[in-house]
């Protein structure tokens, strides 16, 4: 009984396993060869298990057939006393055994049917395996074709990668050239800025110099006017003295002593006049020297202006070279655009070839649509990503190059504007120099006219002195005749004469003070001229250090 129960449970397990296998067979037949080999091994194992179960069932039936006559013999040998009780038990056992035998026969029949079904399934699986093997062979052929196509595409992609690398190297070289051009433009800007700063400094220094010269010229004109006023005062004083002297001469024609004293005073005055003439000549020579120095400075400034013009010409040449470089860069941009168009056409050709290959693969791989679709999607994504990356990289590089070119154009426009401003400033400075030269010429003409007036005034004074000397000599002759008559009057007039002598001494001291003041003013003017010269030398040295 236990053996039959075990056989029933094992048969149920096999039936459930068969049902699970039959359910698994309902799945799509896309398994590989490894799955088929596993199925074959499972079927063989099930066969061995079923054969073992058949053997056990046959042994059980044989043992039951052998036990039936033994039971009959035992029943006959049992005593008739216990026959009533044991017969019922034996009959029950027999009925149970018969039922079990019937059940076993039914199970055997079921197992036979199950085995037949399994054999039919095995044959079906063999047919499916053959179909799968054939399908796998076709898949292998298609896979090999796809691999060959993939290798071709990889080779083409490698060629494209090498071409892209060469393009990247060219683009890096172009970027280096652009950086060099940027550095050169920055250096040009810095040099132009330094030159503009130097020009501004020079213009400021030149303005200060002009202001200083104008101040010096005003001071000199004021000093000359003061000297003219002093000379007019001295002339008026000399005229007053002459009038007073004439009165004295008229009153004291007979006094020889007074004549001698007057001669001495005249000699002193002549010496003073000679000193004044010498000082006037020295001052005129100094003024002429100053004018010559100012003219020399104007010549140096004109030379500096010519140098600045040459620097402007060099700057214009540099701007023209930068413009030529910009034209070259624009040509390079055009070449890059043509290369981009060529690359786009190549990418379109590659995409068309890929589409042709995809259509062929679709025609060949209708049965294996899922795998081919996934692969085609991946290939499409790779191609699109590659093409997009190349396009985006080239577009970004072109955009960056355009931005750089626009920045360079803006910088060149700024340089042109700055150069125009510098030209305007230089034109204004030249106009200022022309005005200053005209002013200097006018002032030099005024100074020459003043010097001529001074010389004429000195000549007139000399003539007047000579005339007065002649008059005095004639009067001396007349006085010698009247000396005898005027001896008595000399005593009375000595006191008056002493007073007049005191007055003349005071006037002489006043004249000496005026002469000292004039000398002091001349020394101041000389010191100012020396300071101007030192300042000019400092400006020249600073200009040489700034502009080389």
Swiss-Prot record:
Keyword Membrane (UniProt): no
Biased composition range(s): Basic and acidic residues: 9-27
InterPro entries: Odf2-rel
Keywords associated with the record: Cell projection, Cilium biogenesis/degradation, Coiled coil, Cytoplasm, Cytoskeleton
Location(s), subcellular: Cytoplasm, Cytoskeleton, Microtubule organizing center, Centrosome; Cytoplasm, Cytoskeleton, Microtubule organizing center, Centrosome, Centriole; Cytoplasm, Cytoskeleton, Microtubule organizing center, Centrosome, Centriolar satellite; Cytoplasm, Cytoskeleton, Cilium basal body
Coiled coil stretches, renumbered: 98-177, 206-282, 394-506
GO cellular component terms given for this protein: centriolar satellite; centriole; centrosome; ciliary basal body; cytoplasm
Main location: cytoplasm
Region described as Disordered: 1-35
Entry similarity comment: Belongs to the ODF2 family.
Protein name: Protein BCAP
Species the sequence originates in: Bos taurus (Bovine)
Chain's gene name: ODF2L
């Amino acid at each position: 009984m236990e053996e039959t129960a075990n056989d029933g449970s094992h048969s149920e397990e096999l039936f459930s396993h068969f049902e699970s296998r039959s359910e698994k067979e309902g799945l799509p037949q896309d398994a590989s060869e490894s799955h088929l080999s596993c199925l074959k091994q499972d079927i063989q194992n099930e066969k061995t298990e079923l054969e073992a179960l058949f053997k056990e069932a046959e042994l059980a039936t044989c043992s039951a057939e052998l036990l039936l006559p033994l039971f009959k013999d035992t029943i006959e040998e049992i005593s008739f006393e216990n026959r009533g009780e044991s017969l019922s038990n034996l009959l029950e056992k027999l009925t149970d055994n018969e039922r079990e035998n019937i059940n076993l026969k039914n199970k055997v029949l079921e197992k036979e049917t199950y085995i037949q079904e399994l054999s039919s399934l095995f044959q079906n699986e063999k047919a499916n395996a053959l179909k799968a093997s054939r399908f796998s062979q076709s898949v292998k052929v298609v896979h090999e074709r796809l691999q060959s196509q993939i290798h071709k595409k990889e080779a083409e992609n490698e060629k494209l990668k090498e071409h892209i690398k060469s393009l990247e190297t060219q683009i890096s070289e172009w970027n280096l050239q652009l950086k060099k051009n940027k550095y050169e433009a920055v250096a040009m800007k810095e040099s132009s800025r330094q030159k503009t700063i130097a020009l501004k400094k020079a213009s400021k220094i030149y303005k200060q110099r002009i202001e200083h010269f104008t101040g010096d010229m005003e001071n000199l004109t004021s000093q000359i006017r003061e000297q003219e006023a002093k000379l007019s005062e001295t002339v008026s004083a000399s005229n007053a003295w002459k009038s007073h002297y004439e009165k004295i001469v008229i009153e004291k024609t007979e006094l020889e002593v007074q004549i001698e004293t007057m001669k001495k005073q005249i000699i002193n005055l002549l010496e003073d006049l000679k000193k004044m003439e010498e000082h006037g000549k020295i001052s005129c020579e100094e003024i002429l020297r100053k004018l010559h120095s100012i003219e020399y400075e104007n010549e140096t400034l004109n030379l500096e202006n010519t140098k600045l013009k040459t620097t402007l010409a060099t700057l214009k040449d540099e701007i023209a070279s930068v413009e030529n470089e910009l034209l070259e860069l624009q040509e390079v941009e055009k070449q890059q655009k043509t290369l981009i168009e060529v690359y786009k056409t190549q990418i379109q050709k590659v995409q068309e070839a890929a589409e042709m290959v995809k259509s062929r693969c679709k025609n060949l791989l209708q049965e294996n649509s899922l795998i081919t679709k996934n692969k085609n999607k991946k290939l499409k994504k790779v191609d699109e990503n590659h093409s997009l990356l190349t396009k985006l990289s080239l577009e970004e590089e072109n955009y960056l190059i355009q931005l750089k070119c626009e920045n360079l154009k803006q910088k060149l426009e700024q340089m042109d504007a700055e150069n125009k401003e510098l030209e305007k400033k230089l034109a204004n400075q030249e106009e200022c120099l022309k005005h200053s030269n005209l002013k200097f010429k006018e002032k030099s003409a005024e100074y020459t006219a003043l010097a001529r007036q001074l010389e004429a005034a000195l000549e007139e004074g000399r003539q007047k002195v000579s005339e007065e000397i002649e008059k005095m000599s004639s009067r001396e002759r007349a006085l010698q005749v009247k000396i005898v008559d005027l001896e008595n009057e000399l005593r009375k007039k000595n006191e008056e004469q002493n007073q007049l002598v005191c007055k003349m001494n005071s006037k002489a001291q006043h004249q000496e003070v005026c002469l000292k003041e004039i000398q002091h003013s001349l020394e101041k003017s000389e010191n100012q001229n020396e300071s101007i010269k030192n300042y000019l030398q400092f400006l020249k040295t600073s200009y040489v250090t700034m502009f080389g």
